Amino acid sequence: MKTKAKYQTWIRMYKLLIFLVISLMLFLVTLLSVNLYLRILSGFLALPFIYIAIILSYSVYQFTAFGGNYQSKIHDLIVSKVNWDGKGKILDIGTGSGSLIIKLAKTFPKSFLTGIDYWGGNWEYSKAQCQQNAEIEGVYNRINFIKASASKIPFNDEEFDVIVSCLTFHEVKDAENKMEVIKEALRVLKPGGEFVFLDLFMDEKMFGEKKELLNILKEYDVSEVNGYKLAEEMKIPRILLNKKVLGNAMILSGKK
């Protein structure tokens, strides 16, 4: 039986378990023979935890292959936005468990690809998992995985023909200004090279207003840039449009 690649979802399972356990504990207090006010208080306290646990649980289901498979569908959408002859080098920033970069490797069989990620910590991805998935999918010989922060990409200026990133920039902890992370990504893109970034770009507290964001990108030597709301590019279940999930998601694509 052929081994299948294992791709983790964007939802960290330990967070889901925390909310489930707290919800269950608070709910159980309401069933105990204790002070009535304590039971009522526990019930009220349980509500937000139950709400978040439901959203996270349903999001995991919709992102997985046995559910809605939306994580793979979103990666397919990003790949479809890459308008390129396939000859050259691709960089995937925040490669996770390798799903997006492996799709790119299959779509562009003459390309050479690099995936960077910080892995470790409380993330449930690993470099070893990426390498194993790439080997299973038959593209291992064309992909190099490197542990690195998106705020300090370990490559020279103008090294890549295409750069992609999916829901990574807002997670970079060692860069308070997320626009600097985008600037760093564009630093290693060749003149005339293409980029496709998907992130929570509609979160104005993090990235500013859309018009301002696009203007700043033009200051980073970008010759062409377009912004697309993810919800307008593909049909997404309503619960995934929660602001904490994909409600603020937007695709930025263009050329340097």
Task: Map each language-model feature to its residues.
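Class I SAM-dependent methyltransferase Rossmann-like catalytic core
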Residues: 8-16, 53-77
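Conserved class I S-adenosyl-L-methionine
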Residues: 86-96, 114
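Conserved SAM-binding strand-loop segment of SAM-dependent methyltransferases
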Residues: 138-150
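Conserved SAM-binding loop of SAM-dependent methyltransferases across substrates and taxa
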Residues: 97-109
